Every structure is written in C-alpha cells, then in structure tokens.
Amino acid sequence: SVFNNIRIPLLYNKKIKRGEHKERIHRAAESLLIQDKLHRKVEQLSGGERQRVAIARAIVCDQPIILADEPTGSLDAVNRDRVMDILMDLCNEKGKTLIIVTHDTSVAERCDRIIRMKDGQITDRAGE
C-alpha cells in the first residue's frame, strides 16, 4: 500500500519512535494531496501520484536535505510543474535544502544554483 511505501524510511530511522509513524505518514501524504490514496496499491496510481509518493517517502523523516534523482523524469509538463511546485514549496516553507539531479533544463532553471557535469567532472556553475 501507499501507506507502507511511505513508511519504509521510518523503519530504518531509529531516532523516530514507531508511535510517531502514523502521524508522520498522514502529515506527509496530506502535504502532497495523496491522503486519500494511502490504502491503495502504488501500482494503481498515475505517474504524478507515484512521484508524490516518492516525495512523501523523502520528507517523512523530516531531514534537512532532500536528494531528488530525476524527480520529474517520465512526467508530462503539467505533472512536472506540479512536482516541482511541491518540492520548491517544501524547501521555501520548511527551510530544506534540495539537491536535484536532472537532464531537464526547465527543472534546472527553477533552481538557485546549477552545477553542470560531464564525464564526472564539473564543467560549469551558475547562481553562486
């Protein structure tokens, strides 16, 4: 279920008590507008909903840094923008640092700083 999928990182975080899991999962799901999907199977969700589940997994432990590897890959333009809006809002509202790996220039353009790499080497920096 979506609930169990979001719970995965909590099971590995020994600092968060099991009694807090349900509340944290519901809070993360609510912030991403997927609270009504918690009892569904992930396979039944749309691509955009699956991306929001992945983001919920990333934020449920409330860490200061979110690492997102191609968070909008395979999404259409509308869902790409929705996912980016959600990620940017989380950073702005909660003071999180977001590190994004992307090949999509429209995603990169929304970032404060950009580091371009080729063959494992930094080739360009912007916004510093």
Regions flagged by a language model, labelled:
Residues 1-8:
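Short coil-to-helix segment of the ABC ATPase nucleotide-binding domain corresponding to the Q-loop/switch region
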